[in-house]
Amino acid sequence: MRSHFAHEINFIGHRRVLLTVSAVLCVLSVVGIIARGLVFGIEFRGGTEIDFQSTGDITIAQMRDALASAGEAEATVQTATSEGEAGFLVRSDTTDPNTANAHAAAAAEALGLTKANYTVTTIGPDWGADTVRSSSIAFLVSILAIIAFVSLRYEFKMSITAVAALVHDLLIIVGVYAWTQVPITPNVVAALLTIMGFSLYDTVVEFNRMNENARRGGDADHRTYYQIVNFSINEVIVRTINTTLTTLVPITAMYFLGGTTLRDFAFAMLIGEVLGTYSSFAVASPLLAMWKTREPKWAKIEKKYGATTATPVGDKTADGAE
């Protein structure tokens, strides 16, 4: 297979710029997490969620006043739309179900609403702690499984750089949540785990092509590992972008047309899909190329042919490929 482009895009030649952009985004994410902190849903910290539906012309100020008079002055209120009807999503730290129901009923009465206009969900702190523990275990097991799979299928260096790209993606997504103060819910955690799969897929596709081209290239064809990696990215980048764009269409529809629950999932997925595609060629592949070039075999080839860049990498390595 030849590159999709008449002239290859020099991704590896711009690796320092790409890695610097990623480093800046990661630093901004860490700053956001430290400075603003993360807002967790009641599923993680325990508390109450009151979903007011079909509230008509009631304003957010009126809702806050009603909640304050009912004993929920510290509750957070956000507007929500379900099936075209206006509503509100209220979150508070109340963990006693009886108290939560009493407060919800009092607020509804003050606003002229009935029991049919709201639902109350209360989660105790123990359940929230279990959710945190389960989510942490899920992420740890996923990372270890990725390292094991990529190491066995390809090599250890590829597994570490693939995980580095995943950490890059997840850190930036969490940073966005810190800066925007959007609550992290179990749906967000599910989205993060899904993003790990998409990001890993993009990276493995590139790694697989690098392996194939590396077997055909090398000293005999005067091909450095940097050149092999760059050509491999150019071979698969169009397919990767097309796959991402195709996936973004239903996710975007889910974000704008779905309810609050679907929007939580879709928001993380929108960010993660873009980051996963970016990190595959801007983080994982450059890091692998830099690491592999230090190996004696590839270091020797780099020293001999590293300055030879006039001939497109694909002219020889791709001959006879589909």
Where in the sequence are the language-model features?
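A structural signal for conserved, well-ordered secondary-structure elements
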Residues: M1-E322
